[in-house]
Amino acid sequence: MAKSAYQILRKPVITEKGLGVKETESTLVFEVSANATKTEIKEAVQKTFKVKVDTVRTANFVGKERRRGKFSGYRPDWKKAYVRLKTGEKMPEYAENL
């Protein structure tokens, strides 16, 4: 069963580094589904924002241990995707307002 674009793209990651690469490299940063592939991420961004994608880079993050008194647990593992747009492509409207 194919996943929808909204199941693959969880939310944009808005950090200083993310805003920096947005300006200099025309790259968008997203938190994505942990089992999403680069081609699925590329197709989801192209379908959702109607832009052409050049490359996709991903990074996996292991959840950190968190404690509440004597109880301990772990944050969930997650994946981040850096999506570079092709030259000449306009940034999506949500990214221009950041």
Curated annotation (Swiss-Prot):
Q: Which residues form a coiled coil?
A: none
Q: Kindly state which keywords UniProt assigns to this record, in alphabetical order.
A: Ribonucleoprotein, Ribosomal protein, RNA-binding, rRNA-binding
Q: Name one GO biological process term.
A: translation
A GO MF annotation of the entry reads: rRNA binding
Q: Does the keyword tRNA-binding apply?
A: no
The answer to whether the entry has keyword Iron is no
Q: Which superkingdom, per the lineage?
A: Bacteria
One GO cellular component assignment for this chain's record is: ribonucleoprotein complex
Concerning Gene3D superfamilies, the annotation shows: 3.30.70.330
PANTHER family for the chain: 60S RIBOSOMAL PROTEIN L23A (PTHR11620)
The family assignment reads: Belongs to the universal ribosomal protein uL23 family.
Q: Which NCBIfam families match?
A: PRK05738.1-3, PRK05738.2-4, PRK05738.3-2
Describe its assembly.
Answer: Part of the 50S ribosomal subunit. Contacts protein L29, and trigger factor when it is bound to the ribosome.
- Give a short account of what the protein does: One of the early assembly proteins it binds 23S rRNA. One of the proteins that surrounds the polypeptide exit tunnel on the outside of the ribosome. Forms the main docking site for trigger factor binding to the ribosome.
| Protein name per Swiss-Prot or TrEMBL | Large ribosomal subunit protein uL23
What taxonomic classification does the UniProt entry list for its organism? Bacteria, Pseudomonadati, Acidobacteriota, Terriglobia, Terriglobales
> What would be the name of the gene that encodes this protein?
rplW
